[in-house]
Design a protein with these regions (language model features):
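Short helix-initiation/N-cap motifs at beta->coil->alpha
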Residues: 62, 78-88, 133, 151-152, ...
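Periplasmic-binding protein-like
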Residues: 120-125, 190, 194-237, 255-260
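Short glycine-rich His-centered loop
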Residues: 35-58
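Alpha-to-beta junction loops
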Residues: 37-38, 73-75, 92-100, 144, ...
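Ligand-binding clefts/hinges and TM-proximal coupling segments of bilobed small-molecule sensing domains
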Residues: 24-26, 153-166, 204-208, 234-260
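Extended ligand-binding regions for polar small-molecule ligands
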Residues: 63-71, 145, 150-153, 216-255
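Acidic, polar ligand-binding/catalytic clefts
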Residues: 62, 66, 70, 75-140
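Short loop->beta-strand "edge-of-pocket" segments that line small-molecule binding or catalytic clefts
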Residues: 35-41, 138-151
Length: 260
């Protein structure tokens, strides 16, 4: 579920970062002066950032950001934009931060941006019908049929454990072929599976295995704003300790996703 960024865009932003002036106003000063945090987000990436039936912008990332703003004592203004230009917009100063399931795992991104304390974690899971009795551990998938995109990391995981791949285009098709018994299980992102189960309570799908190797998403700011980042991370830790992140996880995914 976590976002990708082109090498070209990263290179462009790296050049911009090298030209940043030391006299630049700090992010914390700017936020305090405005009394508002300006946030870049897609608004079309459910269940993280989307519009509900009433048209209100909501989602896990959106509500976490609102809670962080409350902790900081400022208002929040969301600016919806497409993903391809979002981090470039952050670098250009259109936003104070980005809330859009960004993991910031690559060295290229880490050289340009900083990420707060993680507010959710995700990793690979194995999902199959509740009635499945052959799978007790991941090694048990050997010889079973896995509904996977052939070129995905999850497809590679299925090959590693010697499953028979049933080609699909995405999660929706994976679930369909499992329901029609043309496949036995699928490897996929934990948040994607939890979102599906939450939205489809009558589904027969169940998580049988979950990877210990997880990636955390956080709020992203331009490089060099350590003071603001520290306050944002402190707010996220407080929200976790107070149970707010757990409550939001249960609201959007059916369980707490704020811990590994």
């Amino acid at each position: 579920m976590l976002k990708k960024l082109s090498v070209i865009a990263l290179a462009t932003m790296a050049l911009a970062a090298s030209a940043t002036s030391f006299a630049k106003e700090s992010l914390l000063d700017r936020i305090n002066q405005k009394g508002t945090i300006t946030v870049g987000t897609e608004g079309t990436y459910a269940p993280f950032t989307y519009h509900d039936e009433s048209g209100k912008l909501t989602g896990y990332d959106v509500e976490v950001t609102r809670a962080v703003a409350d902790k900081l004592g400022v208002k929040v203004e969301f600016k919806e934009t497409n993903w391809d230009s979002m981090l470039a917009g952050l670098k250009a100063g259109r936003f104070d931060l980005v809330a859009n399931q960004v993991a910031l795992t690559t060295p290229e991104r880490q050289a340009i941006f900083d990420k707060s304390e993680a507010y959710n974690w995700s990793g690979a899971v194995l999902a199959a019908p509740k009635t499945e009795t052959r799978i007790q551990k991941i090694e048990d998938v050997k010889g079973l049929r896995a509904a996977q995109s052939l070129t995905s990391n999850y497809g590679e995981l299925a090959r590693k454990y010697e499953a028979v791949l049933v080609p699909v285009d995405g999660l929706a098709q994976s679930i369909k072929v499992i329901e029609t018994k043309r496949a036995d299980f699928t490897f996929n992102d934990s948040l994607a599976i939890l979102d599906y189960i939450k939205k489809n309570p009558k589904s027969d799908l169940k998580i049988f295995w979950e990877s210990d190797d997880k990636v955390g998403a956080g709020l992203v700011v331009d490089k060099g704003n350590d003071e603001a980042l520290s306050k944002i991370s402190k707010a996220i830790v407080e929200l976790r300790n107070e149970g707010k992140l757990k409550a939001l996880g249960e609201q959007f995914f059916g369980r707490d996703v704020s811990v590994k």
